[in-house]
Each structure stands twice: as structure tokens, then as C-alpha cells.
């Protein structure tokens, strides 16, 4: 029975999540087992969804009409996306490594940032490698089960990031506006609840929307006018009425997008109000610069996603959809570590210490988190 397989081979190993423990303090969770869990469940999702293919045509492969359909610019686009992809992996990987190994970064803020980096690495790896491989092999196809898996992972990871960004803004609000209560309001237990809630919310979105999206009967044309299996692009191939499902998707997006984004806006509004009361002009300028850069990235991420998922698909234009999707699926995972972390003096200091560690061990006093 698959239930027994799930408990013995999936749930039990999930309990043994790898943690770094220093001075009896759990510093950072590395939820690779969560990703492993998703991959183990996917065959069952694929089997369930695959049984619905009897309503479709005899061909079970989809064809992407992606970013490389113009030969004169495809080579340049391939090079740019490759650079962005490997930069995102490197920057996020460096962030996770530094937060793990440097005791000065063992704080709630960097704990949450490490999970943002991990989600970004998984997120971009769900979409970009398939694009690059298809270009190198001169093919544009993806199987039905592969499209289902990509759609599920994408929704799960992007949903988790939506929630996490909102809660990270709340963390900054507490740190700046209520510094005396910060150790209580952002305790280790609260941080674990934030991470668990983000992953749960993202997984719920994936489990709810993926089977419905892939269960529609598709017309003879299986050409997805996109570079990955995004719901609005896939729904355009459906031969059935999708109005009810679009309503369900709209409700989900209100919960997944507008609520976290409202938390972000409210948190930064309170932060800016508090910053205006600072006596230091230099401090105000630095705070405004930091908040503006954060809000730019967050607005880009949420805004593009809102346009994609909260408008009826009859209003969508394929060219615009692909450009907007590039912003929040490819660019954002690269920008997040650069904006949130690598410009920070604490992180640059940790990087210098890591590079100079070969000179000899350094004794460092850690934080209380």
C-alpha cells in the first residue's frame, strides 16, 4: 500500500531533517527532506493525473513555444539566462553556507533569509534547467507527467516564497519598531512556525490547483505558448469551460498574494514612519535606501504574479506573459540574495572571514538565537 510506503520511507526520514547545532542552539534548518518528500509524492500525483489523459489526444507530450523561438536572438537569450541561473545558484548557495558557518549570522533575520535562498535555488531549478536542456538538444517538448511535476513544484515553491516574504517584512517591522520585544516576538519557536507555515501554504496551493489544471481535456494543439507549464498558458489549451476554475484560482491568489503583500506594505509603512523620527540624517537615508530596494524587488515579484494569476486568461497576451514570468521566475531568485543579503555589512564581513579562514581558526562569539 502506498500509505505504508509514505509513512516508512517518506515521513519518517522527514523527521531527521538536517540541522546545524552549535552551543545547544538550533541555528538553521535545511529542509532538503521537504523537497525530497515532494519528489516522492509526485509519482502518485502523476499517476492520478495521468489517468485523466484518456480525455485528451493520443499524444501525451506538450510543446513549448518559449523564449528561443527566434533564431537570431536565441543564442543571446540562452547565454543571458545561463548566466542568471548560475549566478542565482552561486549567490544563494553562498548565503546558505555563510549563515551556517558564521555564528554572527545566527539571528532570526538570517535564519529566514537562509530559507529564502533555499527556496530560490529550488524555484529556479524547477524551470530553467529544462529550458536550457531543450535548447541544447534542439527540442521543445515535455511529457504530460513532467509538465504536471513542474507545475506542482512551481506552485508549491512560489507559494512558500509569497508567505515567507510577507513574514520576513513582519520580522523587520518588529526589529525596528519594537526592538525590546523582538526576542519574544521572533523567538526560535516563532521562526520555526513561520517556516513551517510557509511550506504548508505553498504545498496546499500545489496540491489543490495542479490536479484541477491538468485534468481538463486538451484540444488537438498541445503547443504551450510559454517557456514552462504555467497555469494560464496551459488553460488556453483546454477544450472545456474554465470559468469556474479561474474563479477558484482567483480566490487562491487573493489568499496567496494579496494577504502577504498587504503585510509587506503595512510593515514597511510602519518602518518608514519610525525611520522618519530618527535624529540621524545618515541613518534615515540608509534606512530609506534599504526599504526602497526591498520594496522594488518585492513589488516586482508580487506585481508580476498578480497580473498573471488574477486576470482572466482572455486578457492575457502571450508575449507579455512570458516577459512578466521572466521577472518573477528567473530574475527574482538572482536579485533576492543580492538585495537582501550580499549588500549587508554583516554578510560581507562573514564572506571575508570565510575567505580568510585558511590563515587560522578564529574564535567568534555567537548570537543568542
Curated annotation (Swiss-Prot):
Domain of life, per UniProt, equals Eukaryota
Spell out where the chain is glycosylated: 56
Major site of localization recorded for this protein: membrane
Topological domain spans for side Extracellular: 1-76, 129-148, 213-247, 308-321
Please indicate if the UniProt record lists Transmembrane helix as a keyword: yes
Q: Which family does it belong to?
A: Belongs to the G-protein coupled receptor 1 family.
Function description: Odorant receptor.
Its membrane topology is listed as: Multi-pass membrane protein
Q: Which SUPFAM superfamilies match?
A: Family A G protein-coupled receptor-like (SSF81321)
Task: Please state where this protein is localized.
Answer: Cell membrane
Q: What processes in GO biological process is this protein linked to?
A: detection of chemical stimulus involved in sensory perception of smell
Which pairs of positions does the record mark as disulfide bonds? 147-239
Q: Which InterPro entries match?
A: GPCR_Rhodpsn, GPCR_Rhodpsn_7TM, Olfact_rcpt
Q: Name one Pfam family in it.
A: 7tm_4
- Record's keyword terms, sorted: Cell membrane, Disulfide bond, G-protein coupled receptor, Glycoprotein, Membrane, Olfaction, Receptor, Sensory transduction, Transducer, Transmembrane, Transmembrane helix
What is the name of this protein?
A: Olfactory receptor 2T1
Q: Which residues cross the membrane?
A: 77-97, 108-128, 149-169, 192-212, 248-268, 287-307, 322-342
Per the record, its GO cellular-component terms are: plasma membrane
GO molecular function, one example?
A: G protein-coupled receptor activity
Q: Which residues lie on this side of the membrane: Cytoplasmic?
A: 98-107, 170-191, 269-286, 343-369
